[in-house]
Amino acid sequence: RTPWHMWDVKTCLPPKGADTYEAIRLCEYAIGLAGQHDEEQNPAILHLHIHLLEMSTEPERAMDSADRLGGLCPDAGHIQHMPGHIYVLCGEYEKAKTASEAAILVNRKYLSYAGPYNYYTTARCHDLHLMMYTCMLLGQFEPAMAAAEEICENLPPDVIDLKDKPFIAGTMEGYFAMRMHVLVRFGKWQEIIDSPMPERPDLYCLTTSMHHYAKTIAFAALKQFDKADQEKEAFYASLRCISPNRKLFNNPALQILGVGEKMLLGELEYHKGNYDIAFAHLRESVQRCDDLHYSEPWPWMHPPRHALGALLLEQGHYEEAEEVYRADLGLNDTVPRCGQHKNNVWAL
């Protein structure tokens, strides 16, 4: 009975014991009642309606709620952000970007009022995280990178190092690590190579792993295989420093990095010319990504199907590449609805 347990995304049905259908009926009754009486909508109802439907097979059913919600609480960053949940799922990335920009502006006002040493810092990072994600799917490097940099600016060691709040600390460090996704997504190989490693790998443990992941791919793309292999080994060594109990959003951190492991291996073998081995790794990365629990946005921000499809296409495997892209776009219903990336520029 929490937002992430209202649907089983594999069966497309509510799990046993969930009051999903009843909750949807109640929300839609309240929304309809306000409409009949020409009254302003209740933002809490619209907020819940979005959460109820984002994991369903028809998130567009909450599109009207998303459109109505944004302006109802202009100084509430989370409410400004919430429409983006639906917009991203429906491929309305420019609208998701606009919602995220509004939320980020409001959150800066709250930061100036309350400072960074509070739980709301995680919410501010969440809104920036969605901004990164939607701009990546739009193919817009500069705003995606700006959001990533703002996350890092918001999370110096004294904000992350909350020994009495390990879950919050772990969540915030996970946000910090996301910067590398943007650089890999846009092929910024030299910027990745030039990025310094974290000074405190004990505190920035996910970030350390993500740096080694990105540097492996960067060196592989530049055909510097000795350095790529060194970074690969450093990546595996860094994983041993992450507790099996460490979670990032709704998934174990090591499970999320397992997606990256197979992407890393796939890219490395591809650039070495071992295409069959590379494609096997990338297909496994796709499967691992599909097996993650839903989180908004997804914790692995670079859909493996995009890498697999592009490299298949480059080697002339046109039919499989088409199927991979069609799955990503939601055109063949092989991927659960909330795992599809409608209208994204990388698969179109």
Regions found by a protein language model. Give the residues of each.
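Solenoid-like repeat scaffolds
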Residues: I31-D38, D67-D75, Y113, Y117-N118, ...
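Residue register of alpha-helical TPR repeats
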Residues: A44, H78-H81, Y119-T122, H126, ...
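Residue at a conserved register position within TPR or TPR-like alpha-solenoid repeats
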Residues: L52-L53, Y87, C135, L183, ...
